[in-house]
Amino acid sequence: MNQNSSLSSSGMMGSGGFGFDQFSNNFSIKTKQIESINKMLSLKSESSSSNNNNNNNKAISGWQEVWKVLIFDTHCSNIIAPILTKGALRNQGVTLYLPLHSDRQPIQDVPAIYFVLPTSDNIKRIAEDCKNKLYDNIYLNFASKLSNQLMEELATLTIQSDSVSMISKVYDQFLNFISLENDLFVLNNPRDSYLSFNDTRIKDTQAQENIDMVVDSLFSVLVTLGVVPIIRAPKNSAAEMIALALEKRISTTLQSSGGSNVFSNMNEMGSQLSSFYRPVLILLDRNVDLSVCLHHPWTYQALVHDVLNMSLNQVRIDVTQNGQTSKKSYGLDSSSDSFWSSNTGAAFSSVAGEIKSQINEYYQQMEKLQQITDIKLDDSDDFDNNNKKSNENKTKGLGNLVQEMDEKKRLIDIHTNLATDLTKNIRDRQIDCFFAMEESIITRSLTDKKELHSLITSPIVGETGGRGTLEDKIRLLIIYFLSTKNVPQSEMDQYEDALTKMGADLSTLDFFKKTKAFNESLTAIANVNQSSTQSSNTASGKIGGFMQMMTSVTGYQGVESFTNFFQQGVRALLPKSKDLFVTRIVESIMDLKNTLDADYLYLDPKIQNKSNVPKRTTPFKEAIVFTVGGGNYVEYQNLQDFSKKHNKKIIYGSNELLTSKEFLNQIKNLNKN
């Protein structure tokens, strides 16, 4: 068996002039991962290789048009699902895809591509497949590096069954992460990441495993992007341990024979350019800003995630049509859904107005299409009886228009249903009021404590005068507590008594009380954007007006009923422009403001002499920001707003993207310990 280190992609830069824009356009984690997986599926890497172990002696060139079987484990299924559709797999010649640990029948004369995590259980099952000769031959692709121990185990098992010849090639693909957007990724590891990195009772061996998993996945991200970054991380933190381990792994790889090729995904000139435009990898502990994990969001993507529980770009909601309610699942993909791509970071009130515009545009286009169709049907002169090809082209053109309109209606239906469900939740829970109050607290512009008191102490949803769920109230109280320097004890007692009478579990609040005393970073949260002078009452009033407008909405009745959904000027209902704490840290590091040098490591994996690492003198144009212990869409969107404003490229990643409910549950479990 031959084991190769798979390159993340082939040359991506043209033969013309080179510049930052061309390099920066390739700074897309999703695009790069798709390229790598497509290359794996097409078997293009085999085109110039001979295979000593393949007794079938089949020509590899052109195999991308031949039927192939894709075998994957659950881990790698999660990697593929958000980025490749069934149609995309068919385009690569994959007509059958099956779980590794399932009962599978032999398929003769067909090659099988395995995409799995390197584990002992997977190795044993692969060896069993080889023994049973399920396929013509096998191409093994591991999501992360196959250890020598597992390689030896595979060799031993296949030698014992005389089936070594079944395996054509073995590849380390370095794809052990999940891309959700071009600038967003998460790790493919077990959940409860905040709990894992903050539980003081965890064993040393488990703590090291947690660090190793993050290092392995971040290494995959860097290999896929084809970059060796400068690494920055706060000292005395889990992020520091990950940074040091990652630097060591990169340095060791670069020093090994052929190691530099692992990070090379460009031609010679492109490699020189990527060396000049090196990004910075910023590792941050989740504890640097805890309150952002509890924010009530107001942008579209963040709301869909937090309220509708979107996971891996999939969301499942109740949809009512013709009096019948059923569950529907939607895949939200920015590359194929133009509305989603354009509105993920927009305020929900703006999205609602955009849906109305799309519906109006749809009806206008349908009217025009109907007129064209009527003319074509009525005017026989439009068709040339002597020119069959011309007539076919005209008919095909009409067919394409109809398909385009069907797709447009499908997207309108999806986002109408999502907006309707969000609207119901916003109205019932008064999410707009909680959002406005949190904005005023964080920007230190709170002037109406009566509204704060009402939101926390009023009955819960479902009761007379109800405002929000218990979770909504606890989130608001914690944000107020964390973001306010001195909250009178009598005031806290009043809020806690009210919540306790409603049946609230305040163990999460107890945790934050303990944390606030010694976590210095929380102090900075109270000072976010002190210069903001915009009144919170204005924002609250506008958003409240938005909700009054929506009270007549009772449910989805189809596209037609939605045209009257929004009749008022909702585009003015935008959140205040502000940089969150993580964004300000990123800005400081990227612009070399030197305000964090004493507290943050500066690591360069390319430098052998670690005691004398030269510092960068020009600002960074690209960054990979990774939060250890969980991230969220509020933070992600804030970074993207910053990057667009300052012409930078920022990729955001974390162990997982947490809803506020998930984060609170982890805090609750942590506090039990």
UniProtKB/Swiss-Prot annotation:
Pfam family, one: Sec1
Coiled coil: none
Role: Involved in vesicular transport between the endoplasmic reticulum and the Golgi.
Subcellular location(s) per record: Cytoplasm; Endoplasmic reticulum membrane; Golgi apparatus, Golgi stack membrane
GO cellular component, one term: Golgi membrane
Protein name (record): Sec1 family domain-containing protein 1 homolog
Gene Ontology annotations of biological process type: endoplasmic reticulum to Golgi vesicle-mediated transport; intracellular protein transport; retrograde vesicle-mediated transport, Golgi to endoplasmic reticulum
Family annotation (SUPFAM superfamilies): Sec1/munc18-like (SM) proteins
Family: Belongs to the STXBP/unc-18/SEC1 family.
Domain of life the protein comes from: Eukaryota
PANTHER family given in the database record: VESICLE PROTEIN SORTING-ASSOCIATED
Residue ranges of the TM segments: none
One Gene Ontology molecular-function label: syntaxin binding
